[in-house]
From Swiss-Prot:
NCBIfam families cross-referenced by the UniProt entry: glycerol-3-phosphate 1-O-acyltransferase PlsY (TIGR00023)
Compartment list: Cell inner membrane
Species of origin: Ralstonia pickettii (strain 12J)
Entry keyword Lipid biosynthesis: yes
Name assigned to this protein: Glycerol-3-phosphate acyltransferase
Family: Belongs to the PlsY family.
Lineage per the UniProt record: Bacteria, Pseudomonadati, Pseudomonadota, Betaproteobacteria, Burkholderiales
Length: 207
């Protein structure tokens, strides 16, 4: 198998893995309402938590993070065997993230990508993932806005990557992932600017 064909297969497999929406799968398995039908309508752990089922929210968070990490880890493990270079890994990063945002198995109605991005970053470099998670935690603790923490972390993640690994195709993939994540938070940005965004621990505010 040529490296080009292997890269295409890796990317396609990553997209399909990313397309598994754990918010939807876990909710169905536990007899809960589809998370796309209540709260923010976002199929993610934060919205699943609004169902009142903490276990479902935790499973969603872990599942979404694990799928991102698994896709990238498998690609990195198999890459040397098929001659796939860093460009291929970069494509896998984007593919699994796009799978989460636009899942083929769930009518292309995906989440915002925070947990999946965390899993991807941890798989690329544990210290990169931990630095980004620490950034999220600091912002979340001081400002108590989950969305703001995600946005700030997304901005810093590409810089952390470059500091640790230098400029390469994967750095570009991390930057693109950050842009996509920020774009998925457009409504949250508008609410933050209007002072209507819910803080961590508060009930969702009216739009």
């Amino acid at each position: 198998m040529s490296p080009v064909v292997a890269t295409v297969i890796f990317a396609l497999a990553a997209y399909l893995i990313g397309s598994i929406s754990f918010a939807v799968v876990v909710s169905r398995a536990m007899g809960l309402a589809d998370p796309r039908t209540y709260g923010s309508g976002n199929p993610g752990a934060t919205n699943v938590l609004r169902s009142g089922n903490k276990k479902a929210a935790i499973l969603t968070l872990l599942g979404d993070a694990a799928k991102g990490g698994l896709a990238v880890w498998l690609a990195q493990w198999l890459a040397p065997r098929f001659g796939v270079d860093e460009t291929g890994i970069a494509l896998v990063v984007i593919a699994v993230f796009l799978g989460h945002l636009f899942p083929v198995f769930h009518r292309f109605e995906g989440g915002k990508g925070v947990a999946t991005a965390a899993g991807i970053l941890l798989a690329l470099n544990v210290w990169l993932g931990l630095a980004t998670l620490a950034t999220w935690l600091i912002i979340a603790v001081f400002f108590r806005y989950s969305s703001l923490a995600a946005l700030v972390s997304a901005v810093f993640a590409p810089f952390f990557y470059v500091l640790m690994n230098g400029f390469d195709w994967i750095a570009g993939a991390v930057a693109l992932m950050a842009v996509l994540l920020i774009a998925r938070h457009r409504a949250n940005i508008a609410k933050l600017l209007a002072g209507k965004e819910s803080r961590i621990g508060e009930k969702k505010k009216a739009a």
